[in-house]
């Protein structure tokens, strides 16, 4: 698997590179975000990107947006800032996960593995589960990993797809933010975590939902989200 690493801090980029190569991953390492952008434009064999947020010239957010114009592979952002602003911004424009500097190499590796596993296996449906869902013009095929709305294709990232499928799989029932987070990310949920909310907003945007009156993904305030049968 090929992983793109972009960080203008040479020590950080080199550390990430060593961590991943020691685990058998192929890496593409860039200290220059402009050179990385050119790589993104021409290389369609990247499986995951690790992007630093604060870089001169083209920052990590701009690179993330550039990737999302063409690809759905996972993106992990690196940030030196502890607050939620960077995290929410990154998730809103298409990032899948965040790691705060300084980081534990084992944590970074675990997040990389989790994202790659989700990316490579998202289309594998369990035999006991139904494989399609249809309601109000929305059609989802889990086996083919396709989504359409009134026959128009909707392009979702693997994480967005898993969230939408979880809601549709439980259509008619409210699914809590905690349940969504722990099912999709397989980590303990914190009450202050805005990750689910930001991903729901992105999915709604792609489904062209009216912000004040969404028709497909309903918010049940204080409880969670649901899709009607």
List the model feature ranges, each with a label:
Residues 65, 69, 74-134:
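Basic, amphipathic DNA-recognition helix from helix-turn-helix-like DNA-binding domains
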Residues 24-32, 39:
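Short hydrophobic/Thr-rich beta-strand motif most characteristic of the beta2 strand and flanking loop
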Residues 14-22:
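Charged docking surfaces used in two-component/phosphorelay signaling
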Residues 130, 155, 200, 204-229:
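DNA-binding patch around the recognition helix
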Residues 2, 114-161, 165-174, 178:
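Short, Lys/Arg-enriched segments at the junction into DNA-binding effector domains
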Residues 44-50, 55:
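Active-site beta3 strand of CheY-like receiver
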Residues 7:
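Conserved acidic carboxylate
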Residues 32, 59-62, 86:
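Acidic catalytic/metal-coordinating carboxylates
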